[in-house]
């Protein structure tokens, strides 16, 4: 095996051929598909008389379009029903496992693959979804692809790629109480910008990263793409192995021991050189909330909307647009901004640990009058585990709606949508204009615990001012 960074090693292990122009044909170890970006890809295969090359390396689920209130078939939305039926037919014809509704394994694609043990160190993972970088939390190289590339991977189990540079995001120290991985990644994106990572893979390292749980690492890598990086990863360690052991698709017995030895060898060598390194101090990071229309427009909870004079010249045009769209003036404290809708869920923050953190704030409190609040577990497994712990009751008693799994209001390709000029506190990953349904709806990104704090006060609130209530 070559020496160097994990990225270098995984790249070399999966190289099929060097192509003219400097790109490389890479073997794809795991291909994840869903109902939105796969129909045209399958049609493209049929048009060329091709079949799926490696159905055993292809895994499907339905997530983007599924309703979260009632998942009875047929869906009320005929387009959603058609998309799901098409996925079912394509998977059946191609011999692809579909983790469908009611299977006990359905959910957001970037939630179910890790919980099933499909995402493993040293893999290359591809999916027709921007947030495929999530799987880098395991020490994999994972990247989102477009529909035409989905077709190519279905046909050849490989993909033409240009090799990225590696930037180490070194985070020293420890996060303070009340500060989460979501706050950390929003802080990184705010600092480096939404285009700062273009051309890079982000290697997250340092004592603060090592202290994160696997689900927190998934949150971190999930949003690497929002900082412009094509992928983000964390070197595998004991935390990785403890998470994977015993999961359905993880190795077992002697194969487990051999896998762990190999996974450890993939980690970036101590003497390996990276192309760039940026150092952060975890101790100074506060709960972070976006104020604008990109994930890079973030603020610590004690800060105010910046004036143009505080911004670099290149940031000013988008800031002007954000002032108008968000109806927030320079100098407005982010704490205290009123909220209409509160959403907990998504591939960023819809896992069991996210729901536990949110429930600790919600327990014994009530959603403010006039605020609509709901919780959408990231998968059927997450939902059933949360219900077994009574978290659904905690949320329901606090005034949150408890829903069934799906992407929900992260992108509103389903009935969960903002209306008019509503403003949401959301644990999702994108705050683009119109992202959550309404063309004029507004989104403030924050951690699940911060969403609950906003819900109970009806405005953006520092969760650190609220006492946490553990289960009795």
UniProtKB/Swiss-Prot annotation:
Keyword annotations of the record = 4Fe-4S, Amino-acid biosynthesis, Branched-chain amino acid biosynthesis, Iron, Iron-sulfur, Leucine biosynthesis, Lyase, Metal-binding
Binding residue positions for [4Fe-4S] cluster: 347, 407, 410
InterPro entries on file? 3-IsopropMal_deHydase_lsu, Acnase/IPM_dHydase_lsu_aba_1/3, Acoase/IPM_deHydtase_lsu_aba, Aconitase_4Fe-4S_BS, Aconitase_4Fe-4S_dom, IPM_dehydratase_rel_enz, IPMI_cat
Question: Which EC number(s) are documented for this chain?
Answer: 4.2.1.33
Q: In which pathway does it act?
A: Amino-acid biosynthesis; L-leucine biosynthesis; L-leucine from 3-methyl-2-oxobutanoate: step 2/4
Cofactor detail note: Binds 1 [4Fe-4S] cluster per subunit.
What cofactor is this protein dependent on? Answer: [4Fe-4S] cluster
Which family would the database say this protein is a member of? Belongs to the aconitase/IPM isomerase family. LeuC type 1 subfamily.
What is annotated about its quaternary structure and interactions? Heterodimer of LeuC and LeuD.
Q: What does the protein in this record do?
A: Catalyzes the isomerization between 2-isopropylmalate and 3-isopropylmalate, via the formation of 2-isopropylmaleate.
Know the name of this protein? 3-isopropylmalate dehydratase large subunit
Native species: Synechococcus sp. (strain CC9902)
Q: From which lineage does this chain's organism come?
A: Bacteria, Bacillati, Cyanobacteriota, Cyanophyceae, Synechococcales
């Amino acid at each position: 095996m070559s020496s160097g960074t994990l990225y270098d090693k995984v790249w070399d292990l999966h190289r099929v051929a060097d192509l003219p122009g400097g790109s490389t044909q890479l073997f794809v170890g795991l291909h994840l598909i869903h109902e939105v970006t796969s129909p045209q890809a399958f049609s493209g295969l049929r048009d060329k008389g091709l079949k799926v090359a490696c159905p055993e390396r292809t895994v499907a689920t339905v997530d983007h379009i599924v309703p979260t209130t009632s998942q009875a078939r047929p869906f009320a939305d005929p387009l959603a029903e058609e998309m799901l039926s098409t996925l079912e037919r394509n998977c059946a014809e191609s011999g692809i496992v579909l983790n469908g509704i009611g299977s006990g394994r359905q959910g957001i694609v970037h939630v179910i693959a890790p919980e099933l043990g499909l995402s493993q160190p040293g893999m290359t993972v591809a999916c027709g979804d921007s947030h495929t970088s999530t799987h880098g939390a395991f020490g994999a190289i994972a990247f989102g692809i477009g529909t035409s590339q989905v077709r190519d991977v279905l046909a050849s189990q490989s993909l033409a790629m240009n090799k990225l540079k590696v930037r180490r995001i070194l985070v020293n120290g420890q996060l303070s109480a009340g500060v989460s991985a979501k706050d950390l990644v929003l802080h990184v994106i705010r600092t480096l910008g939404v285009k700062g990572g273009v051309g890079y893979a982000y290697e997250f390292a340092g004592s603060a990263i090592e202290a994160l749980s696997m689900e927190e690492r998934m949150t971190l890598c999930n949003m690497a793409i929002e900082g412009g990086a094509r992928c983000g990863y964390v070197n595998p360690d004991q935390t990785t192995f403890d998470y994977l052991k015993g999961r359905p698709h993880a190795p077992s017995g002697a194969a487990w021991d051999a896998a762990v030895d190999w996974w450890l060898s993939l980690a970036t060598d101590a003497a390996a050189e990276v192309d760039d390194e940026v150092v952060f101090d975890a101790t100074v990071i506060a709960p972070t909330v976006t104020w604008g229309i990109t994930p890079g427009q973030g603020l610590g909870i004690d800060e105010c909307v910046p004036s143009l004079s505080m911004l670099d010249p290149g940031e000013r045009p988008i800031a002007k647009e954000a002032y108008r769209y968000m109806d927030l003036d320079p100098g407005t404290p982010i704490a205290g901004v009123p909220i209409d809708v509160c959403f907990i869920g998504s591939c960023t923050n819809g896992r069991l640990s996210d729901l536990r953190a949110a429930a600790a704030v919600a327990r014994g409190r009530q959603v403010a009058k006039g605020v609509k609040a709901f919780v959408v577990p990231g998968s059927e497994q997450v939902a059933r585990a949360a219900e077994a712990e009574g978290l659904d009751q905690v949320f329901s008693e606090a005034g949150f709606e408890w829903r069934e799994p799906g992407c929900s209001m992260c992108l509103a390709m389903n009935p969960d949508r903002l209306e008019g000029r509503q403003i949401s506190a959301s644990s999702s990953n994108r705050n683009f204009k119109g992202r959550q349904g309404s063309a004029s709806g507004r989104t403030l990104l924050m951690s699940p615990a911060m969403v609950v704090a906003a819900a109970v006060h009806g405005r953006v609130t520092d969760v650190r001012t609220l006492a946490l209530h553990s289960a009795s």
